[in-house]
Protein backbone atom coordinates (compact mmCIF):
# COMPACT_ATOMS: atom_id res chain seq x y z
CA UNK A 1 0.00 0.00 0.00
CA UNK A 2 2.86 2.35 0.83
CA UNK A 3 4.42 1.84 -2.64
CA UNK A 4 1.07 2.58 -4.25
CA UNK A 5 0.75 5.84 -2.29
CA UNK A 6 4.28 6.91 -3.23
CA UNK A 7 3.73 6.05 -6.90
CA UNK A 8 0.46 7.99 -7.04
CA UNK A 9 2.04 10.96 -5.23
CA UNK A 10 4.97 11.07 -7.67
CA UNK A 11 2.67 10.75 -10.70
CA UNK A 12 0.44 13.54 -9.44
CA UNK A 13 3.40 15.80 -8.71
CA UNK A 14 4.85 15.27 -12.18
CA UNK A 15 1.45 15.72 -13.82
CA UNK A 16 0.76 18.90 -11.88
CA UNK A 17 4.04 20.39 -13.10
CA UNK A 18 3.31 19.50 -16.74
CA UNK A 19 -0.11 21.14 -16.86
CA UNK A 20 1.04 24.78 -16.48
CA UNK A 21 3.84 24.24 -18.99
CA UNK A 22 1.44 22.83 -21.59
CA UNK A 23 -1.00 25.71 -21.14
CA UNK A 24 1.59 28.48 -21.11
CA UNK A 25 1.21 30.97 -23.97
CA UNK A 26 4.02 31.17 -26.51
CA UNK A 27 6.53 33.98 -26.46
CA UNK A 28 6.99 35.38 -29.96
CA UNK A 29 9.51 38.17 -29.20
CA UNK A 30 12.63 38.37 -31.32
CA UNK A 31 13.91 38.86 -34.85
CA UNK A 32 12.62 36.29 -37.33
CA UNK A 33 13.86 35.71 -40.91
CA UNK A 34 11.77 33.95 -43.57
CA UNK A 35 12.99 30.44 -44.43
CA UNK A 36 11.86 29.98 -48.05
CA UNK A 37 12.83 26.30 -48.14
CA UNK A 38 10.38 25.46 -45.33
CA UNK A 39 7.59 27.77 -46.52
CA UNK A 40 4.86 27.37 -49.15
CA UNK A 41 6.21 27.83 -52.69
CA UNK A 42 3.55 30.38 -53.66
CA UNK A 43 4.73 33.06 -51.19
CA UNK A 44 7.89 34.11 -53.04
CA UNK A 45 8.59 35.57 -56.45
CA UNK A 46 7.13 38.53 -58.32
CA UNK A 47 3.46 37.62 -57.79
CA UNK A 48 3.01 35.69 -54.55
CA UNK A 49 -0.48 34.39 -53.74
CA UNK A 50 -0.14 35.82 -50.24
CA UNK A 51 2.61 38.19 -49.20
CA UNK A 52 4.73 37.58 -46.12
CA UNK A 53 7.44 39.85 -44.74
CA UNK A 54 11.04 38.77 -45.28
CA UNK A 55 11.85 39.65 -41.69
CA UNK A 56 9.79 40.26 -38.55
CA UNK A 57 10.74 42.24 -35.45
CA UNK A 58 8.43 41.20 -32.62
CA UNK A 59 8.18 42.61 -29.10
CA UNK A 60 5.65 40.98 -26.80
CA UNK A 61 4.46 41.89 -23.31
CA UNK A 62 1.64 40.50 -21.20
CA UNK A 63 -0.79 43.08 -22.65
CA UNK A 64 0.31 43.59 -26.26
CA UNK A 65 2.47 42.51 -29.17
CA UNK A 66 4.32 44.87 -31.53
CA UNK A 67 5.20 43.59 -35.01
CA UNK A 68 7.27 45.28 -37.73
CA UNK A 69 7.44 43.39 -41.01
CA UNK A 70 10.06 44.37 -43.58
CA UNK A 71 10.78 43.17 -47.11
CA UNK A 72 13.13 44.26 -49.88
CA UNK A 73 11.71 47.13 -51.98
CA UNK A 74 8.64 47.39 -49.74
CA UNK A 75 7.63 49.86 -47.07
CA UNK A 76 7.62 48.38 -43.56
CA UNK A 77 4.25 47.37 -42.14
CA UNK A 78 3.88 47.74 -38.39
CA UNK A 79 1.22 47.30 -35.76
CA UNK A 80 0.88 47.03 -32.04
CA UNK A 81 -1.98 44.74 -31.12
CA UNK A 82 -3.65 44.48 -27.73
CA UNK A 83 -3.77 40.81 -26.79
CA UNK A 84 -7.34 41.17 -25.49
CA UNK A 85 -8.74 41.30 -29.04
CA UNK A 86 -9.29 45.08 -29.18
CA UNK A 87 -9.37 46.58 -32.70
CA UNK A 88 -6.32 48.69 -33.62
CA UNK A 89 -5.13 50.62 -36.67
CA UNK A 90 -2.24 49.03 -38.56
CA UNK A 91 0.44 51.33 -40.03
CA UNK A 92 0.23 50.54 -43.76
CA UNK A 93 1.50 52.20 -46.96
CA UNK A 94 -0.23 55.38 -48.16
CA UNK A 95 -3.68 54.80 -49.63
CA UNK A 96 -4.32 51.62 -47.65
CA UNK A 97 -6.47 51.51 -44.53
CA UNK A 98 -5.98 48.51 -42.28
CA UNK A 99 -7.42 47.51 -38.92
CA UNK A 100 -6.78 44.36 -36.95
CA UNK A 101 -7.08 42.53 -33.69
CA UNK A 102 -5.03 39.83 -31.98
CA UNK A 103 -5.69 37.27 -29.31
CA UNK A 104 -3.67 34.49 -27.72
CA UNK A 105 -5.36 31.11 -28.06
CA UNK A 106 -3.39 28.71 -25.89
CA UNK A 107 0.08 28.52 -27.44
CA UNK A 108 -1.04 30.21 -30.67
CA UNK A 109 -1.50 33.85 -31.62
CA UNK A 110 -4.45 34.61 -33.90
CA UNK A 111 -4.44 37.92 -35.79
CA UNK A 112 -7.37 39.00 -37.94
CA UNK A 113 -7.24 42.12 -40.09
CA UNK A 114 -9.14 43.98 -42.78
CA UNK A 115 -7.38 45.99 -45.49
CA UNK A 116 -9.19 48.39 -47.79
CA UNK A 117 -8.06 50.61 -50.64
CA UNK A 118 -9.38 52.29 -53.77
CA UNK A 119 -8.61 50.90 -57.22
CA UNK A 120 -9.74 51.70 -60.78
CA UNK A 121 -12.20 48.80 -60.39
CA UNK A 122 -13.67 50.32 -57.22
CA UNK A 123 -13.04 49.89 -53.52
CA UNK A 124 -11.27 46.67 -52.58
CA UNK A 125 -11.64 44.95 -49.19
CA UNK A 126 -9.39 42.06 -48.20
CA UNK A 127 -9.66 40.07 -44.96
CA UNK A 128 -6.72 38.20 -43.44
CA UNK A 129 -6.42 35.64 -40.68
CA UNK A 130 -2.97 34.69 -39.38
CA UNK A 131 -2.34 31.83 -36.99
CA UNK A 132 1.10 31.97 -35.37
CA UNK A 133 2.72 29.02 -33.63
CA UNK A 134 6.22 28.55 -32.30
CA UNK A 135 8.37 25.48 -31.89
CA UNK A 136 11.79 26.28 -30.44
CA UNK A 137 13.56 28.70 -32.80
CA UNK A 138 10.98 28.27 -35.55
CA UNK A 139 7.90 30.45 -36.06
CA UNK A 140 5.15 29.22 -38.39
CA UNK A 141 2.51 31.61 -39.70
CA UNK A 142 -0.46 30.25 -41.61
CA UNK A 143 -2.21 33.12 -43.37
CA UNK A 144 -5.60 33.03 -45.07
CA UNK A 145 -6.54 35.83 -47.47
CA UNK A 146 -10.21 36.32 -48.38
CA UNK A 147 -11.41 38.71 -51.09
CA UNK A 148 -14.84 38.75 -52.74
CA UNK A 149 -15.64 35.35 -51.22
CA UNK A 150 -12.50 33.62 -52.56
CA UNK A 151 -9.96 32.36 -50.00
CA UNK A 152 -6.36 31.23 -50.25
CA UNK A 153 -4.12 29.93 -47.46
CA UNK A 154 -0.32 29.79 -47.41
CA UNK A 155 2.32 29.02 -44.80
CA UNK A 156 5.53 30.86 -43.95
CA UNK A 157 8.22 29.51 -41.66
CA UNK A 158 10.66 31.89 -39.96
CA UNK A 159 13.93 31.15 -38.18
CA UNK A 160 14.87 33.10 -35.07
CA UNK A 161 18.05 35.14 -35.46
Where are these regions (language model features)?
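Bacterial N-terminal signal peptides that target proteins for export
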Residues: 1-8
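Hydrophobic small-molecule pocket/channel-lining residues, especially in calycin-type beta-barrels
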Residues: 20-161
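A periodicity- and composition-biased signal for non-globular, repetitive helical segments
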Residues: 8-9, 149
